Amino acid sequence: MKPTNEPKKPFFQSPIVLAVLGGILLIFFLRSFNSDGSFSDNFLASSTKNVSYHEIKQLISNNEVENVSIGQTLIKASHKEGNNRVIYIAKRVPDLTLVPLLDEKKINYSGFSESNFFTDMLGWLMPILVILGLWMFMANRMQKNMGGGIFGMGSAKKLINAEKPNVRFNDMAGNEEAKEEVVEIVDFLKYPERYANLGAKIPKGVLLVGPPGTGKTLLAKAVAGEAHVPFFSMGGSSFIEMFVGLGASRVRDLFETAKKQAPSIIFIDEIDAIGKSRAAGGMISGNDEREQTLNQLLAEMDGFGSENAPVIVLAATNRPEILDPALMRPGRFDRQVLVDKPDFNGRVEILKVHIKGVKLANDVNLQEVAKLTAGLAGADLANIINEAALLAGRNNQKEVKQQHLKEAVERGIAGLEKKSRRISPKEKKIVAYHESGHAVISEMTKGSTRVNKVSIIPRGMAALGYTLNTPEENKYLMQKHELIAEIDVLLGGRAAEEVFLEEISTGASNDLERATDIIKGMVSYYGMSSVSGLMVLEKQRNAFLGGGYGSSREFSEKTAEEMDLFIKNLLEERYQHVKQTLSDYREAIEIMVKELFDKEVITGERVREIISEYEAANNLESRLIPLEEQAS
């Protein structure tokens, strides 16, 4: 399908601009006439000169003028010099001697009107015409952006460009299950008669759900690319405008265009922009533009397509829980395909896809990079590869090395290294104790994740240091002891400050907030406390966007007080436990702090080595948690 967008005309070929220029020229032309229809002296003159009234009278007295025209406020005197006629113009002043002087010198004189009907009329009409022209210009621009004319404002044809993507399933790695779910969609589009002969009904819609950056749009393009069918793509927000009824009209145009080129695919990205549930919290939302657009979408999905010329709707969202139930029923979106974050093998495959065209050194180990990036989506991995290439180029390297990839991972997780942010030795010491506390507790707590690196170099917007914990695999479930372990690790920084410096700082504010949220989830959502038992008190907001827990109160004031007391007591209990552990390993932490102060960065291996050496020197039983007992 050829793009329907017409090429823009040059600015000076715009009808409105031409009309304005024509009006200006017309004004100048009409001003050249006198009120009786004859050409004015100004138009016939070769030149005009503005002079004083005294000079005009002097010219008359010296017989240097031939004709004089007297107006209400102006006086004109004409004089012919050879083939040239000169007009002298002056402001008129009350003077009873002027006419006798003209009679005495026998100079022709007459009166003239300083305005005429045409210019007076244009003086009234021009402001109206200018305002009308500007209004038409703005309305025309708005209508073009909306894809329609004055009487076809809702047309979406100019917004729709069919494409045939060259993306294939081989270009998308890390989501094999999702690809398997949509492979038969390709078969439906290629051979619709095979299924029609069997009496099978082709799915009308497939909803792709998952966290941001996991490749939902790429998967939709791959389906169209494999099936070799037209691909119509629009964002959910593209349907909504300020004019009521415009969204519904665009939906009609989109489906009408797709049906003309069937078999084809319609892809609606971020469908939650128009597909949000019409009943929010038990209250019906207003009959607004979004609701009309949704109703039209529901009607179109009920009545379009045939078995021999199918049109399949693919849609993507990371907020499936807010979609309208009518949109999710069978017959509309028959299937939901989860496009989740990749596991270890998936991350390796995604990295292999994105390193194509990147010059890699021999020391690059993609498996190690995949271990460091658990929990990251495909878009994050693509960004890491690109960031590593940029780092290599910035360092004037000819190849991307493993160190560049590791640095890119740290940038993605912890933020940009702030070498220019100078902190005082006192603050540096506080940060060193804080991060050492996190690291030691992480290595000595069952269910926590292994330490990969400890740094006191500022990164990101606010972090003055960080402890990089990298689980080797994504976590889909967490046991109670793992949640407790995470709380202990978060409290380790604050506890180290109090144990070793005997004073606390503001650096643990985010740690305390996260620890509180974990316990709140245990009480109100996971049923892991005596306060709520198995009762769920709050609902999780969004599984894919990490929205935390709902703020709606579905419990009594007494229960709220018990929740607050439970959270406070558990935090205090874990805090005392962490402080005792750090006190037991005081000398090991002092060694760690000294190395951090000198080197600014130490590895996880060095952290474990310091703890092991301290335990061996003091004949202590090892409290280091083996790798197999840590969260993986």
From Swiss-Prot:
Q: Which PANTHER family is this protein grouped with?
A: AFG3 LIKE MATRIX AAA PEPTIDASE SUBUNIT 2, ISOFORM A, ATP-DEPENDENT PROTEASE
Q: Which InterPro entries match?
A: AAA+_ATPase, AAA_lid_3, ATP-dep_Zn_Metalloprotease, ATPase_AAA_core, ATPase_AAA_CS, FtsH, P-loop_NTPase, Pept_M41_FtsH_extracell
The annotation note on the cofactor reads: Binds 1 zinc ion per subunit.
* Residues holding Zn(2+): H434, H438, D511
Can you name this protein? ATP-dependent zinc metalloprotease FtsH
Annotated GO MF terms = ATP binding; ATP hydrolysis activity; ATP-dependent peptidase activity; metalloendopeptidase activity; zinc ion binding
Q: Which Gene3D superfamilies would you find in this protein's record?
A: 1.10.8.60, 3.30.720.210, P-loop containing nucleotide triphosphate hydrolases (3.40.50.300), Peptidase M41 (1.20.58.760)
Membrane topology term reads: Multi-pass membrane protein
Q: Which PROSITE patterns match?
A: AAA (PS00674)
This protein's cofactor list reads: Zn(2+)
Q: What is its main location?
A: membrane
Which family does the UniProt entry place this protein in?
In the central section; belongs to the AAA ATPase family.
Give a GO cellular-component term: plasma membrane
For whether the record's keyword set contains Transmembrane, the answer is yes
The UniProt entry annotates the active site at E435
The UniProt keywords, alphabetically, are:
ATP-binding, Cell inner membrane, Cell membrane, Hydrolase, Membrane, Metal-binding, Metalloprotease, Nucleotide-binding, Protease, Transmembrane, Transmembrane helix, Zinc
Residues assigned to the Cytoplasmic compartment are: 1-9, 138-632
Tell me which parts of the chain lie in the Periplasmic compartment: 31-116
Q: What does this protein do?
A: Acts as a processive, ATP-dependent zinc metallopeptidase for both cytoplasmic and membrane proteins. Plays a role in the quality control of integral membrane proteins.
How does it associate, per the subunit comment?
Homohexamer.
Keyword Signal included in the entry's annotation: no
Q: Name one GO biological process term.
A: protein catabolic process
Q: What transmembrane ranges does the database entry give?
A: 10-30, 117-137
Instruction: Quote the record's binding site residues for ATP.
Output: G210, P211, P212, G213, T214, G215, K216, T217
Which EC number applies? 3.4.24.-
